[in-house]
């Protein structure tokens, strides 16, 4: 179908008249829809930014004021030897989010509780892991977060399916390249399998950023932006924990399999 001065001419030759006012209304509606999507995106990712800033301030203050005997304490630092324990928090948060969505009326204090629920495992991470390790994992997670959400928010509406395919293809290629590197190392097969599985889970979590951004852009009304921000924040923290688990997996397997060299 092509358009000629207010007429729409299908390929079969039939002429359909569309008044110019209706065409302008359609353009205005699309523009307003785009503005509304931007408002929702700004509210949602602005809330995520405030959550990250608040948690960073809390963790920095705690680590600065914490006694020196707390760092790498044998009873406190279970992250390196058993990193799976910190995943209880994101799983619990998902359950609580489901309960929040089904509760009537919704309570904003519950959302604040979900956010603060992530402080204890992050405190343990900051106390027990090397600072360089935590910073590098956080930078990698934020880079993946900004890349996937940026593509979803800035790409035109007509390329939604295309950008989904492109993002998933890039993540698949990245996962394949990492697995090839892992298989070429001189580690045990147990370590290779567990590490590859953890990388797969992390890649899936990163791709979820893109899907969450698409949901925020096209489906989230403004009144539910805060709930969407909490969900995106949970994905962000979960991916950070997955990256840290991969980085500490060598120590984890050495502890449980008593291997001198993986």
UniProtKB/Swiss-Prot annotation:
GO CC field: membrane
Protein name as annotated: Uncharacterized protein HVLF3
Short name of one Pfam family: Bax1-I
Localization (cell): Membrane
Topology within the bilayer: Multi-pass membrane protein
Lineage top rank: taxon: Viruses
Keywords of this entry: Membrane, Transmembrane, Transmembrane helix
Family, similarity comment: Belongs to the cytomegalovirus US12 family.
Gene it is expressed from: US15
TM ranges: 46-66, 77-97, 108-128, 133-153, 163-183, 186-206, 226-246
């Amino acid at each position: 179908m092509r358009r000629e001065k207010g007429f729409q001419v299908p390929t079969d030759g039939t002429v359909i008249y569309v008044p110019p006012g209706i065409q302008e209304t359609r353009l205005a509606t699309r523009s307003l829809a785009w503005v509304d999507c931007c408002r929702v995106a700004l509210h949602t990712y602005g809330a995520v930014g405030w959550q990250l800033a608040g948690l960073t301030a809390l963790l920095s203050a705690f680590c600065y004021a914490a006694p020196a005997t707390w760092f790498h304490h044998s009873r406190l630092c279970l992250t390196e030897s058993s990193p799976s324990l910190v995943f209880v928090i994101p799983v619990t948060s998902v359950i609580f989010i489901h309960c929040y969505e089904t509760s009537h009326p919704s309570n904003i204090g519950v959302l604040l509780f979900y956010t603060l629920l992530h402080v204890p495992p992050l405190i343990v991470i900051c106390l027990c892991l090397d600072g360089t390790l935590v910073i590098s994992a956080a930078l990698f997670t934020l880079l993946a977060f900004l890349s996937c959400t940026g593509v979803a928010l800035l790409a035109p509406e007509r390329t939604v399916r295309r950008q989904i395919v492109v993002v998933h293809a890039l993540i698949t290629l990245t996962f394949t390249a990492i697995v090839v590197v892992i298989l070429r190392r001189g580690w045990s097969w147990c370590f290779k399998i567990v590490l590859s599985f953890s990388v797969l889970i992390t890649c899936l979590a990163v791709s979820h950023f893109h899907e969450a951004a698409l949901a925020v852009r096209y489906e989230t009304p403004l009144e539910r932006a805060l709930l969407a921000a909490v969900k995106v924040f949970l994905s962000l923290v979960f991916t950070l924990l997955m990256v840290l688990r991969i980085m500490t997996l060598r120590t984890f397997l050495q502890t449980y399999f008593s291997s001198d060299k993986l």
